[in-house]
């Protein structure tokens, strides 16, 4: 499918849905803010991955060459704090949880990024960016840190709509700041923390700087689309724009933000204790069903989790799966065809997946009627179109990804990667006789539906009432 009809996307910076015109014809460059690998992933984390995987798949279906960069934040305050609390090296903590995120994305068939840079691998580029900002008069040193001078950039607030007098960075009071609205580019060295040498002394990067430097390294000074969760609009993305453009870069031309997964109207968050872990969800539903559910709402909408909504999604997915199996059994092989015009119109209209799904189920109803009437050609056309459309959404029931393996085994394999990360931390806590932490990890796993049994061969885990590994 190479027809490139007009694609319209909601640009947060413009505040409207507008025509998407790539910087280079036929090519699209995308940067997605990936995980801060401080803990295990929950479904709120992976919704962003699914939402923008659909964008990527749609662009590929339209014939575009897509460069898709998703970073890993592997050095950050929360990572350092949690690693220290667990008595583990920060780099080990980050690497362990990075593997868990990779397993979660893979379980839901989120396409691997073109590149997945880690923040710690791009310190040189970050230092170079700070040097440019200082030379341009947009950054200064103070108290061992380096800060961005917010008042030096008159366009500050263009993404979030924040008025300059209302800006609160959430960094707390710092003696080295000229103005408390300024934000940190580089943090001076502290005892027990990792640090790198710079012209301003040893230290480590600020969170906002990391993404600007990595995006530029892989996509150049200007690129098409920057994606992320809506909670990143301010201050993270606002600060990325300010520092990148102040350094002379055009940076992102479109800004897309996905809504949260909520429970009881509140954002799913570990700090609120209302998370649904990937192990728990993969115990209850198949990976393809979970992906269907996470992608079913419009990407900019909040996705309020409920058991009823989850089961409705499972029922809808199984209905499509059953239809495709009926056609294959009664008619023959079903190859992916082309999406219908209504499906294409829906995705071209700011990725309106709910309308696209309505079209898919309309085609299924037509196909069932054709099959019941003995119209095998009509049923096959419907089935082929459904395969194409569901493939773009990343959950085609007849795709080899889901058909060529036992999905239960696949889900257990993904869960095993996630659980082993926690079991490793528990074993290290036990070695250090930190029984409170070991018990806390065991309790956390149990709340996620995982029972841990200590044996002579080491800890074994099992799903409550299910399989053992």
From Swiss-Prot:
TM region(s), chain numbering: none
Catalytic activity: tRNA(Cys) + L-cysteine + ATP = L-cysteinyl-tRNA(Cys) + AMP + diphosphate
Molecular function terms from GO: ATP binding; cysteine-tRNA ligase activity; zinc ion binding
Motif window: 'HIGH' region: 35-45
Motif 'KMSKS' region, residue range(s) on this chain: 267-271
Residues that coordinate or bind ATP: 270
GO terms under cellular component: cytosol
Stored InterPro entries: Cys-tRNA-ligase, Cys-tRNA-synt_Ia_DALR, Cys-tRNA/MSH_ligase, Rossmann-like_a/b/a_fold, tRNA-synt_1_cat_dom, tRNAsynth_Ia_anticodon-bd
Family, similarity comment: Belongs to the class-I aminoacyl-tRNA synthetase family.
NCBIfam families xref list: cysS
Protein name in UniProt: Cysteine--tRNA ligase
Taxonomic classification: Bacteria, Bacillati, Actinomycetota, Actinomycetes, Mycobacteriales
């Amino acid at each position: 499918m190479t027809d490139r009809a007009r694609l319209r996307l909601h640009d947060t910076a413009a505040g409207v849905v507008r025509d998407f015109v790539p910087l280079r014809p036929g090519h699209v460059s995308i940067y997605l803010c990936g995980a801060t690998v401080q803990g295990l992933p929950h479904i709120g984390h992976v919704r962003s991955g699914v939402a923008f995987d659909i964008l990527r798949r749609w662009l590929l279906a339209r014939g575009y060459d897509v460069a898709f960069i998703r970073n890993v934040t592997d050095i950050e305050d929360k990572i350092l704090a949690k690693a220290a609390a667990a008595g583990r090296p920060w780099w080990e903590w980050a690497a362990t949880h990075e593997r868990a995120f990779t397993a979660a994305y893979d379980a839901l068939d989120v396409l691997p990024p073109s590149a997945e840079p880690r923040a710690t691998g791009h310190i040189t580029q970050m230092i170079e960016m700070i040097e440019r900002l200082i030379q341009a008069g947009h950054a200064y040193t103070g108290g061992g840190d380096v800060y961005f001078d917010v008042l030096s950039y008159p366009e500050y607030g263009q993404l979030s709509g924040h008025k300059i007098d209302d800006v609160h960075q959430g960094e707390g009071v710092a003696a080295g700041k000229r103005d408390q609205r300024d934000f940190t580019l580089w943090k001076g060295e502290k005892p027990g923390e990792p640090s790198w040498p710079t012209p301003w002394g040893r230290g480590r990067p600020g969170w906002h700087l990391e993404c600007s430097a990595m995006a530029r390294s892989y996509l150049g000074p200007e690129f098409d689309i920057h994606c992320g969760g809506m909670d990143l609009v301010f201050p993270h993305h606002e600060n990325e724009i300010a520092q990148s453009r102040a350094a002379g870069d055009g940076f992102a031309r479109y800004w897309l933000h996905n809504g949260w997964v909520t429970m009881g109207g509140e954002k799913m968050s570990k700090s609120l204790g209302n998370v649904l872990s990937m192990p728990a969800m993969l115990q209850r539903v198949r990976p393809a069903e979970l992906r269907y559910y996470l992608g079913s709402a419009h990407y900019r909408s909040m996705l309020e989790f409920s058991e009823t909504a989850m089961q409705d999604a499972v029922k809808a997915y199984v209905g499509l799966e059953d239809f495709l199996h009926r056609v294959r059994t009664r008619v023959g092989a079903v190859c992916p065809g082309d999406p219908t015009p209504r499906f294409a119109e829906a995705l071209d209209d700011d990725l309106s997946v709910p309308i696209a799904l309505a079209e898919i189920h309309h085609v299924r109803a037509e196909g069932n009627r054709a099959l019941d009437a003995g119209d095998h050609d009509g049923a096959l056309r419907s089935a082929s179109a459904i395969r194409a459309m569901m493939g773009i959404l990343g959950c085609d029931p007849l795709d080899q990804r889901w058909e060529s393996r036992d999905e239960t085994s696949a889900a257990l394999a993904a869960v095993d990667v996630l659980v082993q990360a926690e079991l490793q931390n528990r074993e290290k806590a036990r070695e250090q006789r930190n029984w409170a932490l070991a018990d806390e990890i065991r309790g956390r796993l149990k709340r996620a539906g995982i029972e841990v049994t200590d044996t002579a061969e080491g800890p074994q885990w099992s799903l409550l009432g299910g399989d053992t590994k």
